[in-house]
From Swiss-Prot:
The lineage of its organism: Bacteria, Bacillati, Bacillota, Clostridia, Peptostreptococcales. Its EC number is 6.1.1.7. This is Alanine--tRNA ligase. SUPFAM superfamilies: Class II aaRS and biotin synthetases (SSF55681), Putative anticodon-binding domain of alanyl-tRNA synthetase (AlaRS) (SSF101353), ThrRS/AlaRS common domain (SSF55186), Translation proteins (SSF50447). Catalyzes the attachment of alanine to tRNA(Ala) in a two-step reaction: alanine is first activated by ATP to form Ala-AMP and then transferred to the acceptor end of tRNA(Ala). Also edits incorrectly charged Ser-tRNA(Ala) and Gly-tRNA(Ala) via its editing domain.
């Protein structure tokens, strides 16, 4: 058997199926397109679901892919075993109502034996126990000996998820030999030992399972095969671990160099090295596909993987950010097959670095919180940290349990690991439920799915704002009806419509539909499946029936304002790329009649100078009166024109190209002005961050821009009037006022501090002796927390021995400060525990060390009541 590299196997597979007249589809992004049932693409067939269900038409009846996938369900096992990984590539061949079992099995056998050159006697096959057809193909056409064809039950060899398309499958196994065997005479595929490795699953989707559990034959059966690239590479390279495959080994070696460690040194080191290697690959691909770190959804998955890898770097002794430097190794290894990694290399590296640096801060934050909690435990004479708190540190702050245990051991403390594991299991169960609930979501039907697939809509809104259309369907309360009447809110599908459906960030059109005695208000328009456009209608008068011909008219002003903003968005996108950098990618947009919102990839806020440059450039192109033209072209032709495609968007063979002069070329299905001069004026309102590595610009055009400028002018005139200053002198006058105010505030603070210090001797007269310990409690009027601490420290020096509890009002809130001398702390006094009870009465909380603590409260009127309990708290602490 010839030894082959992973990249070589990938190319060989795709070339083989291209020869078999399959359309070779580049890997879809890891972010599912229009599929809310999945967080991330986790299987080769996942992006093709709509082709299997018939909702969308595939580019060819035969397809082949090498699909990027992410699975994190078993993340805790990654690193601990040699086969678990979060990122993997799935080779797949598919047929939609074309060839079936015979060709699928024959070509699978041909590729495995002739192209991969696997020994025939090493390959076994399994079939579903009731699938005599597949068994017969293996026995009679492939001529595989009966003893190497295994019949397995539904659990192993029948693919189904709830209701919908399903069918039997046949799997190819590679026999690794006796040394991996369990030793039993009946050892064969299906055994739990490591001898037989399943490497290629052929699913024959020939049934449609209904709600009653019946398996109905599909009129056009499908083929769905999947072969894990890393797994077959293990076979071809005769290695036991995916981390020994050539591509993974290259990354792992660079991790060893960066961490100054050796692989196979010890178990703990191996686990950390594997985790870093796997997670580095995953995060590079995820960021390359437009995912950014966040606290929810797929962004949280990315953040967790990145921080987990960074944490294992710390366990190996790495004290600074290092993952971003290793990313180049992933690009070197996979860049030939995935060009986006090369194109976005600098951007991916920057995002990793920013997130890594943030994690360093997080570790420090978690450490502070843990240390504070340890002090509280000491005060309560506790020596075991509850597992729920440890899990909160882990889950919320990314603070690892290993580090928590290590810190506790230094204080001769432990953590309740069983309680921690219980919380971890609860989280796993939540994740499993989310996954199991989501897996079938994409196959569920609604009233629209039940409609005839020939019901489609032709959009006429590019050419006209008014068009006649025939009512093909009416949906009322998720039921298909033939008739509806005044007062109802329904969704209708027309054969022709001028109403643009919400798509590509542009909101749907509004307007009216009418005929004779009937009138309806179009509240919204959305894109449905199968080239249908849904109009959301409120029936104002009359009756509407399926089959009626009606007039539809789009409200002109909102549409034209939306077009202004949409074309301006294209100009903005181009200006950002030119001024900020080519790494800028659209990460989201919203185009309404009132404003535009544009989210884009960039790792830091834009300076005022850069924003001014962007705004100026867009306005210059508006003044240049550029013609806006649209052309239909093939995807390849559009790319040759230099058209900007939206990353992650799913495009067909033919696309619509929007050209704004020679300045901007984008793939876009939206509506636009005819000439850039129609936009009028472009004005940026704000630039903010919405997530790590994602910035947002909000802007207005046309009349909205004019009205905004007039409002701003009005405000400036009012300020000029108040300050009795005109024009250019306004800024200077405001600076003078701010300087004067700052100086007055400083003088006021100095006076307050002086008065407070002058009254210290008077305050010392209020000392009481409780159980042989000095106690000084005082309620000031208004003092900042900083002043309260300074006064407390001064009193502490003067008192020599004892406890000081102070309260004051600051910014309409209560502030408390408690401090105790060392000798009193040794008697059992704990300032942090004391102040927590005090602050509760004023509607707040806080804590701190035994010798010093501060807290706040929402109710300043309760400061005196809160301070009144200090005497009792001190007695309790002194008496143990």
């Amino acid at each position: 058997m010839k030894k082959m590299g992973l990249n070589e196997i990938r190319k060989l597979f795709l070339d083989f199926y291209e020869e078999k007249e399959h359309y070779v589809q580049s890997s879809y992004p890891l972010v599912p397109h229009n599929d809310k049932s999945l967080l991330l693409i986790n299987a080769g067939m996942a992006p093709l679901k709509n082709y299997f269900s018939g909702v969308e038409t595939p580019p060819s009846k035969r397809m082949a892919t090498c699909q990027k996938c992410i699975r994190t369900g078993d993340i805790e096992n990654v690193g601990k075993t040699s086969r678990h990984a979060t990122f993997f590539e799935m080779l797949g061949s598919f047929a939609f109502g074309d060839y079936f079992k015979t060709e699928s099995i024959q070509w699978g056998w041909e590729f495995a034996t002739k192209y991969l050159e696997m020994p025939e006697d090493k390959i076994w096959a399994s079939v579903y126990e009731e699938d005599d057809e597949a068994y017969g193909i293996w026995e009679n056409q492939i001529k595989m000996p009966k003893e190497r064809i295994v019949r397995l039950g539904k659990e192993d060899n029948f693919w189904e998820i709830g209701v919908g398309p399903c069918g039997p499958c046949s799997e190819l196994y590679f026999d690794r030999g006796d040394k991996y065997s369990c030793g039993h005479d009946d050892c064969k595929p299906g055994c739990d030992c490591d001898r037989f490795v399943e490497f290629w699953n052929h699913v024959f989707t020939q049934f449609d399972k209904d709600e009653a559990g019946n398996y109905n034959l599909l009129p056009n059966p499908n083929i769905d095969t999947g072969m894990g690239l890393e797994r077959v590479a293990c076979i071809m390279q005769d290695v036991d671990s995916i981390f020994e495959v050539d591509t993974m080994k290259h990354i792992l070696n660079s991790v060893c160099t960066a961490t100054n460690t050796q692989y196979n040194k010890d178990v703990k080191t191996n686990i950390s090295l594997r985790i870093i290697t796997d997670h580095l690959r995953s995060i590079t691909f995820m960021i390359g596909d437009g995912i950014l770190p966040s606290n929810e959804g797929r962004g949280y998955v990315l953040r967790r993987l990145l921080r987990r890898a960074a944490r294992h770097g710390k366990l190996l002794g790495v004290s600074k950010s290092f993952l971003y430097e290793l990313m180049d190794t992933v690009t070197e290894t996979y860049g030939g097959a995935y060009s986006e990694l090369v194109e976005k290399k600098d951007y991916i590296k920057k995002i990793i670095q920013v997130e890594e640096d943030r994690f360093q801060e997080t570790i420090h934050q978690g450490l502070e919180i843990l240390n504070q909690h340890i002090e509280e435990m000491i005060g309560k004479s506790e020596n075991m940290l509850n597992g729920t708190y440890a899990f909160k540190l882990y889950d919320t702050y990314g603070f690892p349990l290993d580090l928590t245990k290590e810190i506790l051991e230094e204080r001769e403390m432990t953590v309740d690991e069983s309680e921690f594991e219980s919380e971890m299991e609860k989280q796993r169960n939540r994740a499993r439920k989310a996954r199991s609930g989501g897996d079938t979501e994409g196959w569920k039907e609604d009233a629209f799915d039940a409609l005839d697939k020939n019901i489609q809509t032709s959009f006429k809104g590019y050419e006209t704002l008014r068009a006649e259309g025939k009512v093909l369907a009416i949906i009322e309360e998720n039921q298909s009806v033939n008739l509806t009447s005044a007062g109802k809110e329904v969704v209708i599908v027309l054969d022709k419509t001028p109403f643009y459906p919400e798509s590509g960030g542009q909101i749907g059109d509004i307007g009216h539909i009418f005929k004779d005695e009937f009138e309806g208000q179009v509240l919204d328009t959305k894109q449905g499946k199968n080239q249908r456009i849904h109009q959301y209608i409120k029936i104002l008068r009359g009756i509407l029936q399926v089959g009626d011909s009606i007039q539809g008219e789009v409200d002109k002003e909102p549409r034209h304002n939306t077009e202004r903003n949409h074309t301006a968005t294209h100009l903005l996108h181009k200006a950002l790329k030119g001024i900020i950098g080519e790494h800028v990618e659209q990460a989201g947009s919203l185009v309404t009649p009132e404003k535009l919102r544009f989210d884009f990839s960039h790792f830091e806020g834009l300076s005022s100078a850069d924003l001014s440059k962007v705004e100026l450039e867009v306005n210059q192109e508006i003044l240049n009166a550029l013609n806006v033209d649209t052309v239909e072209a093939s995807l390849e032709e559009a790319k040759k024109m230099g058209a900007m495609a939206l990353f992650g968007e799913k495009y067909g063979d033919d696309v619509r190209v929007v050209k704004t002069g020679d300045y901007s070329v984008e793939l876009c299905g939206g509506t636009h002005v005819k000439n850039s001069s129609e936009i009028g004026t472009f004005l940026i309102l704000s630039e903010t961050g919405v997530a790590a590595g994602v910035r947002r610009i909000e802007a207005v055009t046309g009349q909205e821009a004019y009205h905004h400028i007039k409002r701003e002018q009005g405000l400036i005139q009012d300020i000029e009037s108040l300050l009795k200053t005109k024009g250019e002198q306004l800024t200077k006058r405001v600076e003078e006022l701010l300087k004067e105010t700052k100086e007055k505030d400083k003088e006021l603070q100095q006076l307050k501090s002086k008065l407070a210090n002058q009254s210290i001797d008077e305050i010392l007269n209020q000392i009481e002796v409780i159980e042989g310990t000095n106690l000084l409690v005082h309620h000031f009027g208004e003092q900042s927390m900083e002043d309260l601490r300074n006064i407390g420290d001064s009193l502490k020096q003067k008192i020599g021995s004892g406890v000081i509890a102070l309260g004051a009002e600051s910014n309409d809130k209560a502030s408390f400060f408690v401090t105790a001398t060392k000798d009193v702390v040794e008697k059992g006094v704990h300032s942090g525990n004391m102040i927590r009870e005090v602050a509760k009465i004023a509607g707040g909380g806080g804590g701190g060390r035994p010798d010093m603590a501060q807290a706040g409260g929402k109710n300043p009127e309760k400061i005196q009541s809160a301070l009144s309990i200090v005497k009792g708290l001190l007695k309790n602490q002194l008496n143990g």
